[in-house]
Amino acid sequence: MPLLVKLGICELAVGVLSGWAMIAIVERAEALKRLGVRQLGRIRQTHLDLLMQGTILTVVGVAVASVPTWIGILLVLGAYIAPLTLGVLAFRPELQKGSMAYRGLNTAVLTGFTVAWVALAVTVLSR
């Protein structure tokens, strides 16, 4: 089984587990706020992104034979880190505009992710 498929399924598992946080938003929002969650919507955003990115990694792993290693690395980093940076904002929303470190990390991850997707498209179309 291709590594991208395995990593995609693992990310899907994390996304499914994060569904419990979605239940907590509905049934125990105050408890989440006591735990430091300041933006409940970011939990939903993280949950959905984990599910989507996990699905996409799995599909790419099945559909594309021999993804070049450097492209696979950038895809996995983007698929794993991007949702987690959204999760951080649930607790620290001010980081989005007030932290150069956060913005730098986010920009680097999304740039790498974009490069990987364009490179994957070029690779697939050239075969």
Question: Predicted regions: what is each one?
Answer:
Residues 10, 25-30, 62-63, 87-88:
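Non-transmembrane, aqueous-exposed alpha-helical and coiled segments at domain scale
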Residues 25-42:
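Cytosolic, membrane-interface loops and tails of multi-pass inner-membrane proteins
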Residues 81-97:
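Transmembrane alpha-helical segments of integral membrane proteins
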